[in-house]
Amino acid sequence: MEAKVEKIETNVVKLEIKVEAEKFDAALTKAYNKNKGKYNVPGFRKGKVPMAILKKMYGIEIFYDDAVNIAIDESYNEALKAEDIRPVDYPKVDIVEIGEGKELVYTATVTTYPEVEIGEYKGLDIKKPSYEVSEEEVEKQVKEMQSKNARVETKEEGTIADGNIAIIDFKGFVDGEAFEGGEGTDYPLEIGSGTFIDNFEEQLVGLAIGDKKEVNVTFPENYGKEELNAKPAMFEVTVKGIKVKELPELDDEFAKEVSEFDTLAELKENVKKRLEESNNERAEREFEEAVITSIIETSKIDLPEVMLTKEIDSMMKDLESRLQYQGLSLDQYMEFTGNTIEKMREFMKENAERKVKADIILEAVAKAEEVKATDEQLNERALELGRMYGPKDPKKMANILLKAQKAMIEKDIIIENTLKLIKESCK
């Protein structure tokens, strides 16, 4: 095998690859053995027709397609390795010369993994933010628990007040026409919850059972359905019932009923601890995002379009999987949100570009700093994945994953270790 490389443009090369005549003839023989059972020739059992007879009857060209595929499979990867080329997509192959007893000459034009000029990543002037938990936040969480555990009783007389649950029928109109999804029957709406459009719930305060009212509101600009964004709407509302929440006392008995704690003080302490953990996770995410933003901004990289397209494809598949788990199809989701596949892909583009660039840059930093994944980290991560995908026998699943996806698992850990290295060096 002989290969020549020509740079066509940024991140695109053309390889001219020559396969020796003997190797191409061997590929023709393999193609014959693969296909000889397809031909019926009088005087020969099926699959026993000699290659010379088939060549005479049909021409050697009948084996070219399979022989070319066999020869390319054997020579293309060898050429990539010899020339230290890392492709990111399938090649476009053109045959230059072909024939029995001759060299096979073909070109393979392929998009390559981009080169990166790493920017500043050591000693970045970025600090991890810190978020304190206030007593007000703790009280708010406890009150939410109190609200969720409230008894609901029917209000026989009187009018709707803030905090009540109004049982309503409603039908919405935009430009005088009813719109899809704007109708409900016996809907329990908690006044003050902010469930409906701004200023909807407030207009129900003071109404009694049996009252009807036209509620006028305006949809927000980013409502999610293009035909409703920023549109004024009128809802015909009928009050069918009113319910009142009876809140339990916030005391030690409440703590025992809603948690594993014996006292309200212990419950509040646990709530505070969980809020602190949540704040720490938020701070870590923001710190990490700031670091990634910095290294992307100071690094130079020409991102091949195909890598961006593949990442968006992956994000779309993830979205579809999450929707299926919730019992929705992608088409249903698009209909509900007023989106299209094209708009969703465009929406994902910025995040996809950021992720691909970050991975490429961090991989380059990892190479420069000789960052590795330890055996302990590999085994631990495989076991985590094993618990997720094979809960009945996590260890067995972990072993399967280590054999099938070790390179991918190792890459993820190296990226994480590299990011940790950069964060630890921040001032």
Curated annotation (Swiss-Prot):
The keyword Cell cycle applies. It holds the Pfam family Trigger_N. This is Trigger factor. It catalyses: [protein]-peptidylproline (omega=180) = [protein]-peptidylproline (omega=0). Keywords: Cell cycle, Cell division, Chaperone, Cytoplasm, Isomerase, Rotamase. Its main location: cytoplasm. InterPro entries: PPIase_dom_sf, PPIase_FKBP_dom, Trig_fac, Trigger_fac_C, Trigger_fac_C_sf, Trigger_fac_ribosome-bd_bac, Trigger_fac_ribosome-bd_sf, Trigger_fact/SurA_dom_sf. Residues 163-248 form the PPIase FKBP-type domain. Consists of 3 domains; the N-terminus binds the ribosome, the middle domain has PPIase activity, while the C-terminus has intrinsic chaperone activity on its own. GO terms for cellular component: cytoplasm. It is found in: Cytoplasm. Belongs to the FKBP-type PPIase family. Tig subfamily. Its EC number is 5.2.1.8. The gene is tig. One of its GO terms (molecular function) is ribosome binding. It is an enzyme of class 5 (isomerase). GO terms for biological process: 'de novo' cotranslational protein folding; cell division; chaperone-mediated protein folding; protein transport; protein unfolding. The keyword Glycoprotein does not apply. Transmembrane segments: none annotated. Involved in protein export. Acts as a chaperone by maintaining the newly synthesized protein in an open conformation. Functions as a peptidyl-prolyl cis-trans isomerase.
